[in-house]
UniProtKB/Swiss-Prot annotation:
The keyword RNA-binding applies. It is found in: Plastid, Chloroplast. InterPro entries: Ribosomal_bS18 (IPR001648), Ribosomal_bS18_CS (IPR018275), Ribosomal_bS18_sf (IPR036870). Belongs to the bacterial ribosomal protein bS18 family. This is Small ribosomal subunit protein bS18c. It comes from Populus trichocarpa. The gene is rps18. Its main location: plastid.
Amino acid sequence: MDKSKRLFLKPKRSLRRRLPPIGSGDRIDYRNMSLISRFISEQGKILSRRVNRLTLKQQRLITIAIKQARILSSLPFLNNERQFEKNELVARTTGLRTRKK
């Protein structure tokens, strides 16, 4: 190969495989809160499969487990902690406004 053609070749990067977020020994169950909480956003939403890097089967099982935990009141449907913090900081006036005549 000529030197002029070699300039355009990109150096190969080594690909490092990421470890799967769910190990082979982890049981996907609605009672396993430490596992389930990793796949929920701060707002309480189920994260997508692409974000979680799960297989299709694992994502289905995680989704079912999260929904079961929500129904059994182990998990909240919404996480409103941020809204409560904002409401506490904002001072609201409860008095009536007087009109100038």
